[in-house]
Amino acid sequence: RRQRQMCIRDRFTVVNQYTIIENGRNKRPDLILFVNGLPLAVMELKNAADENATLQSAFRQMETYKETIPSLFTYNELIVISDGLEARAGSLSAGFSRMMAWKSADGKAEASRLVSQLEVLIQGMLNRETLLDLVRSFTVFEKTKTEDLKTKITTIETVKKVAAYHQYYAVNKAIESTIRATGINRGCDGPMRESPTNYGLKDVSSQPIGDHKAGVIWHTQGSGKSLSMVFYVGKVVRMLNNPTIVVITDRNDLDDQLFGTFADCKQLLRQTPVQAEDGEKLKSLLSVHSGGVIFTTIQKFQPDDGENVYKTLTERSNVIVIADEAHRTQYGFKAKTVEVKNEADEVIGSEIKYGFAKYLRDALPNATYLGFTGTPIETADINTPAVFGHYIDVYDIAQAVEDGATVRIFYESRLAKVELSEEGRKLIESLDRELETEEMNDVQLAKAKWTQLEALIGSPARIKNVARDIVTHFEQRQEVFEGKGMIVAMSRRIAVALYDAIIALRPQWHSDDLDKGVIKVVMTSSSSEGPDIVRHHTTKGQRRLLAERMKDPDDELKLVIVRDMWLTGFDAPCLHTLYIDKPMQGHNLMQAIARVNRVYKDKPGGLVVDYLGIASDLKKALSFYSDSGGKGNPTEQQEQAVALMEEKLEVVQHLLHGFDYHPYFMADVSHKLSLILQAEDFILGLDEGKKRFVNEVNALSKAFAIAIPHEKAMKVKEEVAFFQAIKARLCKFDASPSHKTDEEIETTIRQVVDKA
């Protein structure tokens, strides 16, 4: 209501072809949206009937405006581009891959595909209330610091981020649900996005006023969940008169990562977040009457030895608890009997322990609880709804991939490439069954089998095989696909052994310096683990530096080996390959594979490489995912990319039907260049030949990048290189020197190098 009243007082003006002269240059953007005289949005619209009018050309035009008339963008909130059919919007600093469609005109349902995307964006995003809401509550600035290792010059880059449609509607619905849950007599204004009931799931609309359960937001990993939490806190602090926010994670490294995201966005929060190192610090921070954004881990809510009730930290009701990954088992209420041991590790008795959810309620009895999760809540899970309530909003894999919020994940089994005995396979199956239980004695039994399996997986001969295969596989992918890789090892010992085996093959990849080297191990260790392991120990500050290096696509660090770290919450968009050599299942597996689903330039997808036979675990995870209401596959077989590559290869070959290019592969350099020019001339003679050829070769290149180093991809490598060379020639004279071609705008797929 307050937002609507503000809109009435504001003056909104849209101007067509407004002339701007700056530094002697005269430019006329298609549309400028002024609010009280400030140009908050600039729109570049291309003619749908013009075959050269593309989203990319509209984006290039906008880049030209930024260079030639920069003062127009001083107050800019949004840039909008459209080719007449599609329409996308983004912030001033967004690259082309981060320009996103706005899929709902009213926030209650996704718009029909028969309705123009531009019309939907104008109605949904550029209406007066939403535009001002985006300015006030859904815009953040993140600064990243990079240091040139040669010059030691530090560069600070500021990136402006604006909420995508799924974040905007989910957060506003969460605000309404929080108001209801705190006891204020005001319910949700109906589903502000596709209702969870469409997935066969219960939603918060059925919950009573004042139940202190704000609900759960399920947004698939990689779709901006952390930023959604920031937007929520920034707005709820204003809407509910500065409540205290307690953000809870279940691991210290996750706490640090999420805290870092919030700390970067303190302008929106209007306060500086703090971390509570222990229960006493937490109690001290909660002693104030209002305000504060406090970070802590769920493990801090552990009562003293012999106690099964956690002391109350505050009885205030203006406290909102936000839990990241709210589905995890530690939020349970269930009591368990656990053994008590003395210093000699002898059992001397037993005691009752509850799940952390009970202790959390003991500590903050009148708080309101909100959960965020990247994976669905299990159907049989009664703890999560008991603590947080039902779903507020669902944004699953299918929707995220369709929207371009994430990329597809492909799966490749390399089990046949490395030795794992029949004994080892049986041990993995047995271990999986026993680790699924939550009973302590069964977990202890599983530890013994884990030790056995670790010895088999970590045998010197097998480690050498895995290392050799990873080096070959990764180098072949790097030839055609710019990016980085992560190796997941079963134990610290195996992580170090793998590192040593890889370095034996590629000594030049090693460096003792933290800021140098192509490969690093990211882990902690204790002094009792021996010097070989301890030398790879990293402190929090060192891991932060390694994370910055890993996220920087230009840094020489290309591979990291981890055991548990960075498998949840770590966001490196240029990461494209995950090598798994560790038994994993369920939520942990889903979280791990999502490391490679981030959008980066024109990255066609991420690849999960399996050395242990986790296919059955992936199937279970998929079954659980779909049973829980999710749409879309968490992973797709690499064979699908190979099939698409073959299909696109055939299409490109058909375009060159009638032109014999086979002599190219046996010709010398001068004849090769001549054949490329002849092929270019042949393509230009076809009806819309250039456009069709460029589009099909782009599609072929993307499928080829995912398929490599499959043997079928390796067989056609030279042919793909030839087609890419023709495409490069066709595109070469497309743009003036001051403009980038479509292909030069953010590309991660490398042209296959012709060795001749």
Q: Which residues make up each language-model segment?
A:
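Conserved RecA-like ASCE ATPase "motif II neighborhood" in helicase/translocase motors
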Residues: 292-359, 541-547, 562-564
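Interdomain helical connector at the RecA1-RecA2 junction of SF1/SF2 helicase-like NTPases
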Residues: 381-482, 499-503
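Long, hydrophobic alpha-helical segments
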Residues: 600-700
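Accessory helical-bundle/CTD segments and flexible terminal tails appended to RecA-like ATPase motors
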Residues: 660-756
